[in-house]
Amino acid sequence: MAIKKCSLRTMYGDYPSADYFKDFLHKIYPCKEPFELLVVDKKPKTRAGVYIYDAHRIRIYAPWGHLKETAIHEYAHHIHYTECGSKAHGERPHGPQFWEIYGALMCVAVQKGLYVEERIEKNAKF
């Protein structure tokens, strides 16, 4: 199944929709717990995205760019929180277990051709 690119027109430009990102993330790993995903037309000073644990909600702040990478990062927080049990609840948000999950998701995304880092692709000499 191909990922449909539905755009979201914002004051900063066109971005893929929340449904696009949910499909993208489920292709990498179909998580066990449902979550809400919002693409927000806002640019906070310090973050490109946020995972709100108690609401199982991912927010991606579109103007920052790197949307797929941000979506995977916040999805890793969701998986860490919902699938690693009480052990994850006491751990730092960016502890070793989180980075293991994030790294695994990124590897799968690259292997499936869903994520290509532009800096790597641009500099590759094949």
PLM region spans:
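Short pre-active-site segment immediately N-terminal to the catalytic Zn-binding motif
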Residues: 54-71, 85-90
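Post-HExxH zinc-binding segment in Zn-dependent metallohydrolases
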Residues: 87-126
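A structural signal for well-ordered alpha-helical segments within the folded catalytic domains
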Residues: 19, 65-66, 96, 100
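Catalytic zinc-binding patch centered on the HExxH motif and its immediate surroundings
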Residues: 38-57
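Short, solvent-exposed loop/turn segments at secondary-structure junctions
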Residues: 42-45, 65, 76, 85
